[in-house]
Swiss-Prot record:
Compartments where located: Endoplasmic reticulum membrane; Golgi apparatus, cis-Golgi network membrane; Golgi apparatus, trans-Golgi network membrane
Keyword set includes Membrane: yes
Record topological domains on the Cytoplasmic side: 1-124, 168-180, 226-234
UniProt membrane topology term: Multi-pass membrane protein
Organism whose genome encodes this protein: Bos taurus
Transmembrane intervals: 125-145, 147-167, 181-201, 205-225, 235-255
Family: Belongs to the YIP1 family.
Name of the coding gene: YIPF7
Keyword Calcium applies: no
Protein name: Protein YIPF7
One Pfam family per UniProt: Yip1
GO cellular component, one term: cis-Golgi network
InterPro entries reported in the protein's UniProt record: Yip1/4-like, Yip1_dom
Amino acid sequence: MSNLGQFDSDFYQSNYTIDNQEQTCNDSNACGNLYGSRKQQASEQPQPAFVPAEMLASSGYSGQFFQPASNQDYYSPSSYIDSFEEEPPLLEELGINFDHIWQKTLTVLNPMKPADGSIMNETDLTGPILFCMALGATLLLAGKVQFGYVYGMSAIGCLGIHALLNLMSSSGVSYGCVASVLGYCLLPMVILSSCAIFFSLQGTFGTVSALVIIGWCSLSASKIFTSALAMEGQQLLIAYPCALLYGLFALVTVF
C-alpha cells in the first residue's frame, strides 16, 4: 500500500507554484508590452505623400474593369460604309476603261480622225484580246481553225514592230503599248473575216477587199504610232511593216 500511495503522489506531483503563476503573468505582460511597442512603431511609420485630387482625376481610368470604354466612331456602321465608298471601282483597279476602249475603237474605224496620243499611249490589252478572239471565232465559223496562226503571228508581229519603233523613236515605246495599238487596228480584219462567213473571198472582189482592209489597218496603226510617239513625217515608214503584218492576217482570212 505504501508503494501505491507513493505512485499516486508521484503521478499527481506538479511543479506549478504561485511563483510560476506570477512569472507567467510577467511574461504575458512582457508580451503585451512587446505587441504594444510593435503596434506603436507601425503607427509611427511615415504616411505616403499627399496626391492632389486633380492629378488623380487626370490619370484615372474613366471606364470600368472588364468593360473597356466604347468608341462610337470606330464601331459605327457609317465608318465602314464610307471606307467602301472611297475605294475605286474594280474595273478601274484592273485598268479597264470602257470610255477609252470606245474612243480607240472609233479612232481605228475612222482613219482620217486625229488620234489622241495620251489615250493611245496606254497599255490596254482588253480590246486587243477581244478582237483577236473575235477574229479566231469568225474564222472558225468560216470553216478555218486558225487560232494558232492568229496568236503566233500576233506575238511575232508585236515583237518586230516593237524593235523597229524603238530604233526609230527617240523616246522609246513599251511592248504593251505596241500590242495594244496593233490589236485595236485588227478590227477591220475582223470585219473581213465576218464577210468570209457569208460568201467566198477567193476572187477579184475578195482580193480588192483584202487590199482595202490591209491599207485601212496599216493606216490606222501608223497614225496612232506617229501621234503617240511624236514621229511626224515618218508615217509611211511605220505603215510599211504594219502592212506586211496585216497582209499575213489577210492571207489567212482569204485563203
